[in-house]
Amino acid sequence: MKLVDRLTTGDVIYTSCVGIHLCYHLGIVYDDGKKKTVYHNSPYNKNKYGGSVCEESYETFMKEREIMKIIRTSATNYDILDASRKCKTEIWDSFFFNCEDYVLEIVEGHRRSNLRDSWKIAALGIVILIAL
């Protein structure tokens, strides 16, 4: 059995970033009973509304990526579609709307990014070291 066959709606897939080290990328699985796709927010995406949230086949999403981990959540197809409709015109932004913001808005109901917070702490540490 292939991994994609074991995925269910709401599974959050953490993968490597394409061409960038020291980061990860998130997508969330949508299963309509006929096919499984992955919704995600990427600076390389452009949907028909000009935003950066797109739905792709699992195979397309996984091109040039490696799975880091998969987390099962209680997010439903409705949750995914509702959040995607609300932000359909928004463009990926590393500070305000990255892949983690998008997926965690679906799963938790609000935006947040652990990766961005880690980079902020690292930048603050560098500034403090330089100031000393």
Predicted regions located by residue number:
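Histidine-anchored, small-residue-rich loop motif
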Residues: 59-89
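Short linear sequence motifs
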Residues: 51-54, 71, 85, 95
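Glycine-rich catalytic cores of cysteine/serine-nucleophile enzymes that process amide/ester linkages
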Residues: 4-69
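Activation targets extended, charge/polar-rich intrinsically disordered C-terminal tails
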Residues: 83-132
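Generic hydrophobic secondary-structure packing signal
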Residues: 23, 79-80, 99
